[in-house]
Design a protein with these regions (language model features):
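N-terminal export signals
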Residues: 3-4, 10-31
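Residue-level detector of Asp-centered blade-edge/turn motifs that repeat once per structural unit
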Residues: 37, 100-101, 154-155, 223-224
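Short loop/turn segments immediately following beta-strands, especially the blade-tip
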Residues: 73-78, 126-132, 173-181, 242-249
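A short beta-strand motif characteristic of beta-propeller blades
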Residues: 82-87, 136-140, 205-208, 254-259
Length: 264
């Protein structure tokens, strides 16, 4: 019998696998609006290997059975999705982001380990406009362990990364050919860890996991690109940064963020 894991972490990762294609669809719909004959593609990130460094007090996730990035062609009239192949990766590309032109895709490789510190990685891909297939451009360190979220800065010259197990966020420059450069900035979260159970959330909710250490879980720029926000679910805090678009630096804002009720 399948065991239901009510942790917030497990729920969110399942949701990402099911709904994580929406940024791609939005970008590619804009890019392909002038060419109705071009394929409309959806890409789904998966867990393709177990999380080796999960602490016993942290979430209990089963080994992933995905095979990397799964590709689907979307029927423009009905929305039906037809399998169109897969880009095999054993590093759990669990979160994906595609640029507005639909020509580049970036993946957070959550279970990759690229050096002795256990740092994860992020990969850049070129998207073939004829058939939507992916070609790996390069892979670089993510600035911390367990990269779980990636998003593009509105100007398109930087990729923002949240590293769940490292409790850090990073800024990676996007080079002219779409490849990723080394991080221009890395910030490590610090502070008092919240309680295991939520203060206000009712029993059975998803708000009772991730309070064993810092866990950066999401990072996003505002539409103007002047500010970047990221959340740490271990600290129950939203960080606010001013963004230096010339150097790719995160500068503490005043105020530097907001703390939320513990566990909520």
């Amino acid at each position: 019998m399948m065991r239901f894991d009510p942790s917030r972490r497990s729920f969110l990762k399942t949701s990402v696998a099911l709904a994580g294609t929406s940024p791609f669809l939005a970008g590619l719909l804009r890019a392909q609006s002038h060419d109705a004959g071009a394929p409309l593609m959806a890409y789904v990130g998966t867990f393709s290997s177990p999380l080796q460094d999960v602490l016993p007090t942290q979430v209990d996730l089963p080994p992933g059975n995905g095979r990397g990035i799964h590709l689907f062609q979307v029927n423009r009239a009905t929305g039906a999705m037809t399998p169109a192949g897969e880009h095999r990766m054993g590093t759990s590309p669990s979160c994906l982001a595609v640029n507005g032109a639909g020509t580049r895709l970036y993946s957070a490789n959550e279970t990759d380990r690229v050096n002795d510190s256990g740092e994860g990685s992020v990969s850049a891909f070129a998207v073939n406009p004829a058939d939507g297939q992916l070609k790996l451009l390069n892979t670089v360190p993510s600035g911390g362990a367990g990269p779980t979220y990636v998003s593009l800065h509105p100007e398109g010259r930087f990729l923002l990364v949240a590293n769940y197990f490292g409790g850090s966020v990073a800024v990676l420059p996007i080079l002219a050919d779409g490849r990723l450069g080394e991080a221009t900035d890395v910030k490590v979260d610090a502070g008092t860890i919240g309680p295991t159970r939520a203060t206000h959330a009712p029993p059975g909710s998803f708000a009772f996991s991730g309070h064993d250490r810092t866990h950066a879980h999401m990072i996003q720029a505002d539409p103007s690109g002047r500010f970047v926000l990221h959340v740490d679910l271990g600290l129950d805090r939203i960080y606010v940064w001013r963004f230096d678009e010339q150097k790719g630096l995160l500068i503490p804002n005043d105020p530097a963020g907001v703390s939320l009720p513990p566990g909520d």
